[in-house]
Amino acid sequence: MSKKLWGGRFEKGTDKVVEDFHSSIRFDQRLYKQDIRGSIAHARMLGRQGIIAASEAEQIIEGLEKIMADIEAGRVEFDVAAEDIHMNIEKILTERIGDVGKKLHTGRSRNDQVALDVRLYLRDEITETGRLLRELITVLLERAEEHVDTIMPGYTHLQKAQPITLAHHLLAYVQMFGRDCSRLVDCAKRFNISPLGSGALAGTTFPLDRMAVAQELGFDGITENSLDGVSDRDFAIEFCGAASLIMMHLSRFCEEIILWSSQEFSFIELDDAYSTGSSMMPQKKNPDVAELIRGKTGRVYGDLMALLTVMKSLPLAYNKDMQEDKENLFDAVDTVKGCLAVFTPMIRTMRVRGERMKAGAKGGFTNATDVADYLAKKGVSFREAHEIVGKMVLMCVQKSVALEDLSFEDFRACSEAFEEDVFDAIRVERCVADRKVPGGPAPDAVKAAIQAARERLS
Ligand code: ARG
């Protein structure tokens, strides 16, 4: 049994089973960079404040920089017995530079150290996730620009409702992913403050310059209460909440991709590079990527629920339960990034079958509202017009024809308000073009929306 950094008050070593059980080095080694950055800033401040000698601070910093380089080069092996990344690095440091290494932890606890590391980690990952989201939005805007005139059916209840365009449909997702971006930014804004100096729970007797450390590490300020500084994991939960919404949006889009690429819809064809085949059925081309993203949505929701449940009812301040925050947080980060990285090129390369979309927009009485609107514009009340057109649809269903296939006499028989111009007014192109209201599907409104989204992006 190995000697622990905290072993002073113990008469016996840790049982081997316990050692394996409570060690987190297997997963928290991913925080090595943040841990070393934090330690360097802490050591520099200790030296500047005269808490340790300036030369000692220098030795520590130099030692930490070498450890960083060695970890990066794959030359460091971590030790399960040293528990976590924080103690592994401190242990290596002391092995290398001698007793002066033991001064690094002055005025610090692993509790504020780990709170710092996770914040630094998440800050970088939020930047990367935001970049991936903006890349997706850029591709959506490019594809929308191509398809401003590509008419397709819009649905409610997955029943054909009214004609829209593919561009308009894609722009709905631009809105969702735009909100996701702002949620990430907002979340980072709230947690970008340094907990170092909170100590184990009650701060420290050493005259630390918390603000200087925070500034060196790129924080906007410091946490205002030492208990909260070490026991707050709201930011991890907020991130998982934001990540869950990203996944929810991706899964809705994926569901449509899966439907649209079915033979029954045939609205799109995924590129071969983003589809897979069947081991038995030679004809198959499956939208596995979209399905897998839809499936992975569940794990990110699971990560969110796991974190909420870990934190539920924990008394202040730090409790070892909180070591369980990392694997779920890392999983959410990896999953959302992995999904975005494959979803974006899948959308960029998918082939759109405009003729199939337009054909789809034509069946199913998608212009029925336009017939009613036509009557309302000719002075019939909308409620009455709705009733008249409902009867016309019933008549069409019985005859198996579309509204535009009715003769002018048929129209007149239903309402005297119909004139010859009704046929032009209910063409599917007109149905789209006349919905010029801001936020609507008319090509000019969509072009304006693309322009506005581009401006927001830059
Ligand atoms: N590995 C620990 C964690 O991730 C670090 C903090 C440990 N603190 C303690 N008092 N045992 O939560």
UniProtKB/Swiss-Prot annotation:
Where on the tree of life does the source sit, at the highest rank?
Answer: Bacteria
Catalytic function, reaction form: 2-(N(omega)-L-arginino)succinate = fumarate + L-arginine
Cite a single GO MF annotation. argininosuccinate lyase activity
Query: Where this protein primarily resides, as one coarse class?
Result: cytoplasm
Which NCBIfam families does this chain map to?
A: argH
- This chain belongs to the protein called Argininosuccinate lyase
Native source species: Heliobacterium mobile (Heliobacillus mobilis)
| Gene Ontology biological-process entries | arginine biosynthetic process via ornithine; L-arginine biosynthetic process
Q: What's the source species' lineage?
A: Bacteria, Bacillati, Bacillota, Clostridia, Eubacteriales
